[in-house]
From Swiss-Prot:
NCBIfam families assigned to the protein according to its UniProt record, in alphabetical order: murC
InterPro entries named among the record's database cross-references: Mur-like_cat_sf, Mur_ligase_C, Mur_ligase_C_dom_sf, Mur_ligase_cen, Mur_ligase_N, MurCDEF_pg_biosynth, UDP-N-AcMur_Ala_ligase_MurC
Protein name: UDP-N-acetylmuramate--L-alanine ligase
Pfam annotation, one family: Mur_ligase_C
Enzyme class, UniProt record, top EC level: ligase
Natural source organism: Campylobacter jejuni subsp. doylei (strain ATCC BAA-1458 / RM4099 / 269.97)
The gene coding this protein: murC
EC number(s) stated in the UniProt entry for this protein: 6.3.2.8
């Protein structure tokens, strides 16, 4: 049995790979800087997790796989190199993990986790590796004795080019992570085209500025004309979205927002290659959403508290539109957004767009930037958001939120945005 060690095993994407290889019969261990909910869960599942990194953790290992966050000076990485242990980045390890599978890969700047998770509900015989927790299964990985595997493919480091897709879905090709592509949009778009070209079956959002010009044969979704009568409702505080897709009939899915109808439509069009429409409609009802995507943590007549992973203006704008609809349907008079900016570079490049994205809220609370390992950039956020409340911290107390300055947030619709630490701040310790 091969011993595989993961450096940075607490990451949402890398932990899914570790879980998958464990189910395949490999002996898995890992390490991370600090303990987290994911590392605790992995230990319960029988994975030896060491906190923090130490060079001895890689002794007697046959292979080391490391996350994108790991630098060359990491003690485990350095020692593994000295000992001649094979070291693969997550990107380099993908062919090893996916080589014997028929891969249904989902890529795009926004919506790939949601589209992947909906596809997982529809193609319920497939294994799943995604960068989010599926509420239906309580994990970011599902292992099935099947040739089929649904994979959330990442464009940020071009690792999606190593996913060998049989079926490829691209939700959109908006410019994100341009630093990896030499700040050239054309290089990013070339990578998306290469990803699609590799697949036998391609499903695309044909109204995306880049994808609308994709020349090879593909199944095309034109959202503005193919998605009709999109409506939302709340049942016992749970959100649902109904819509008609092409001439395929009406569909209803857990969650809220036009963007959800778009993601679901792409998943449905992909699944139609393997299932009849009646089966798809029935299985869509099993979908329970994913953690951190319009994730309702508490709801009563006076207060609804929502956690969302949105960290780019496009995502925030779409989710706030859904939040406004939820507030209207639920009779909540006030919308408060709590924003933890993620990465200085993203914030600096999109400052004006972030300001526009939050225009519809009644109150905006801004937390310190979550650097994600970046060097700080001087940004005058108070000039960009003159009406915002800036606080050092916020924490959950019962069903309410309390800021470091003493303000209590206890009514209306409160929604937190960010890909850093905000999710932990919004949740009770056991959530």
């Amino acid at each position: 049995m091969q011993n595989i060690h993961f450096i940075g095993i607490g990451g949402i994407g890398i932990s899914a790979l570790a879980r998958f290889l464990k189910e395949k019969g490999f002996k898995i261990s890992g390490s991370d800087l600090k303990e987290s909910k994911i590392t605790k869960e992995l230990e319960k599942e029988g994975v030896k997790v060491s906190i923090p990194h130490h060079k001895d953790n890689i002794l007697n290992k046959d292979l080391v796989i490391y996350s994108a966050a790991i630098k060359e000076e990491n003690p485990e990485f350095k020692y593994a190199k000295e000992l001649g242990i094979k070291c693969l980045s997550r990107k380099e390890a993908l062919p090893l993990i996916l080589e014997d599978k028929r891969v249904f890969a989902v890529a795009g700047a926004h919506g790939k986790s949601t589209t992947s998770s909906i596809l997982a509900s529809l193609l319920d015989d497939a294994s799943v590796i995604i960068g989010a927790i599926l509420k239906e299964f309580g994990s970011n990985m599902i292992y099935k004795e099947s040739q089929n595997l649904i994979f959330e493919a990442d464009e940020s480091d071009s690792s999606f080019l190593n996913s060998n897709p049989y079926l490829a879905i691209v939700t959109n090709a908006e410019a994100e992570h341009l630093d990896h592509y030499g700040n050239e949009v054309s290089k990013l778009h070339h990578a998306y085209a290469e990803f699609l070209d590799t697949a036998k079956i391609r499903v695309i959002n044909a109204e995306d500025e880049f994808l609308k010009n994709y020349k090879n044969e593909s199944i095309k979704l034109y959202p503005s004309k193919d998605i009709k009568n999109c409506t939302m409702c709340i049942e016992n505080f749970k959100p649902f979205t109904s819509f008609e897709l092409k001439d395929l009939g009406e569909f209803k899915i857990f969650g809220m927002g036009y963007h959800l109808a778009l993601d679901a439509s792409l998943a449905i069009l992909a699944a139609l290659n393997f299932l009849d429409i009646e089966t798809i409609g029935a299985r869509l009802k099993n979908y329970q959403g994913i953690k951190k995507r319009f994730d309702i943590l508490h709801a009563d007549e006076n207060l609804v508290l929502i956690d969302d992973y949105g960290h780019h203006p496009t995502e925030i704008k779409a989710t706030l539109s859904a939040a406004q609809e939820y507030a209207k349907l639920g009779g909540y008079k006030k919308i408060t957004a709590i924003f933890e900016p993620h990465r200085y570079t993203r914030l600096a490049v999109n400052l004006k767009e972030f300001a526009k994205a939050f225009e519809g809220v009644d109150e905006l609370v801004i937390l310190p930037v979550y650097a994600a390992g970046e060097e700080p950039i001087e940004i005058d956020l108070k000039a960009v958001f003159p009406k915002a409340l800036f606080v050092e911290n916020i924490q959950r107390e019962g069903k309410f939120l309390v800021a470091s300055k003493g303000q209590v947030f206890e009514e209306g619709l409160i929604i937190g945005f960010g890909a850093g630490d905000i999710s932990n701040k919004l949740r009770q310790k056991n959530e």
